[in-house]
Amino acid sequence: MAPLKPAGASRLINKSHLHQLFVERLNADLHNAQLALQTAHEAATHEENVAENKYDTLGLEAGYLAHGQARRVAEIEQALLAFRALQLRDFDADKGIQLSALVLLESDSGQQRRLFLVPDGAGMKVPTEEGEVMSITPQSPMGQSLLGKAPGDFVRVNGQESEIVEAL
């Protein structure tokens, strides 16, 4: 956990920089998924993987793997498009936490979590000097509980209550 900064100083990273870190992460994930798709496609179409009898399923299994990899590539491409289109907005106390908010939560035990509310690509984590930041979507239970809230409010998800310490 990153040490706390002096009073009045933000314990959250700059959102533009954070946004770029997530885009870079998605680009790297896309590259890896495309390589995996290419490998799976080559295995599925390789002449040695043609079934010789009804029990020889290597080619069929490779085809299923290639299909799954193609879906993964499409999911990452969709998330990347959503991230690139995301307009970063400053926190507005009148509206509360909205899409593109960067939120610092603290549990009763003092554990801090940094969350970035994004349209797609939930569950990704990127390391920062301030601490790890995880992407969540408004469709998730945590995302739903944060929408409209402000620093000082409490949220409860999966039986654990946390205070919203800061929102940008």
Model-found features: residue ranges?
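N-terminal intrinsically disordered, low-complexity, charge/repeat-rich segments that act as generic
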Residues: 2-92
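Short, charged beta-turn/beta-strand-edge "cap" motif at the junction between a beta-strand
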Residues: 109, 159-164, 168
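Alpha-helix boundary/interfacial micro-motifs
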Residues: 46, 137, 156-157, 161-162
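Non-DNA-binding regulatory cores of transcription-related proteins
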Residues: 91-156
